[in-house]
A protein has these predicted regions:
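C-terminal capping/lid region of NAD(P)-dependent oxidoreductase domains
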Residues: 2-5, 298, 302-311, 322-341
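Short glycine/proline-centered loop/turn elements that form peptide/ligand docking sites
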Residues: 84-85, 185-195, 232-233, 256
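Residue-level marker of beta-strand positions
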Residues: 93-94, 110, 247
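A structural motif shared across PLP-dependent enzymes of the aminotransferase-like
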Residues: 102-114
Length: 341
């Protein structure tokens, strides 16, 4: 097929407040050339995550970048070219993926992405419905099964701190569909309480008084905690609630330290989850992300998982992406926002 030599993208050269005119700008770039393991994808929809806002704010905090940086770490699109070592994909296939934080992102008409972190998109979902799922599903899956090492058949308890966001919602759904865990999730507003209940949480508690809220449910300790909201702010509560020999995982970095020795008496563990680790370090098991997305797509098509789409923005412009970033930065969003190109 005939492809253009250039493409439109939205990027930035300065880390500015999203309300400022040049916080995101429209640019023209050369069409990416796929590497030997790459798919070249014509992007049809994508989604914005907190990672996008963090990278935009930090990448050029004290400098102006020589070349615009393009972010975007969720996408659905059509394969239009591929590298010589790609297997399992053909031109014309519809795919979805989160991508690689070290490479240009999906805020562009075309994107080159490693086929080992890509899967065929769910057949029953629209582009917008599918676009909101890769990053949060991969994060939730890795946290549950790779970091916390949950065994699907064990009847234990999981506390999700930050249940109404994308990762929290995915964690609740996956845990309830694929394990025997009792899931407790935090929510602090009526609308978020309703949402996490719809996601499948067995108990909904308020994070403002976390220990007492959990224990009011008749639960003294929890076997697993996944924090997707505030690691340092909830540290003492997590230490109090974690069961002896339990495990805590988090995706939220923090300034300063926490006292890990508080976990020593319980022989409890703490482990980070970063969805980009496998692609960042080109790990030997990088293809596991393709395998996870394959299973997520099947679960979505079977109706066992629900898309987290709550809003769709339409059009490819800097203003549309700014609106999506404002939604994320408000910290009050429920579910996820997609951008339909």
């Amino acid at each position: 097929m005939s492809l253009p030599s250039t493409m439109k993208a939205v990027g930035f050269t300065q880390s500015l407040a999203i309300e400022q005119e040049n916080s995101l700008v429209e640019i023209t770039l050369d069409l990416p050339k796929p590497g030997e393991h790459d798919l070249l994808v014509q992007v049809t929809a994508n989604s914005i995550n907190p990672a996008d806002a963090k990278i935009r704010i930090r990448s050029a905090a004290d400098k102006t970048l020589e070349q615009p940086k393009v972010i975007g770490y969720d996408a659905v699109g059509i394969v239009v070219d591929k590298g010589e070592k790609v297997s399992g994909f053909n031109i014309g296939d519809r795919v979805f993926y989160a991508g690689d934080v070290t490479r240009p992102g999906s805020n562009a008409e075309y994107q080159a992405v490693d086929h080992r972190i890509t899967a065929h998109a769910p057949k029953s979902l629209t582009d917008a419905e599918a676009a909101v799922m890769p990053l949060v599903s991969l994060t939730a899956w890795e946290a549950l099964f790779d970091r916390l090492r949950v065994t699907p058949t064990e009847k234990k308890t999981l506390l999700v701190i930050g249940g109404a966001g994308g990762v929290g919602s995915s964690t609740i759904q996956i845990a309830k569909q694929l394990t025997n865990l009792t899931v407790i999730a935090t929510a602090s507003r009526p609308e978020t309480e309703k949402w996490v209940t719809e996601m499948g949480a067995d108990y909904v508690v308020n994070h403002h008084d976390l220990v007492n809220s959990v224990r009011a449910q008749g639960i003294e300790h929890v076997d697993y905690i996944f924090n997707v909201a505030d690691t340092k702010g909830h540290w003492d509560a997590m230490v109090e609630l974690i069961a002896p020999q339990g495990f805590i995982s988090s995706i939220v970095e923090f300034d300063g330290g926490v006292d890990l020795s508080k976990l020593q008496g319980k022989s409890a563990g703490f482990i980070w989850e970063l969805m980009f680790t496998r692609s960042l370090f080109q790990t030997d098991d990088m293809i596991k992300q393709q395998e996870i997305l394959f299973q997520i797509a099947n679960l979505l098509d079977a109706g066992r998982l629900k898309s987290l789409l709550t809003e769709t923005l339409t059009g490819f412009s800097a203003e549309v992406f700014k609106t999506a970033h404002q939604r994320i930065e408000s910290s009050r969003s429920i579910g996820k926002t997609a951008i339909q190109f």
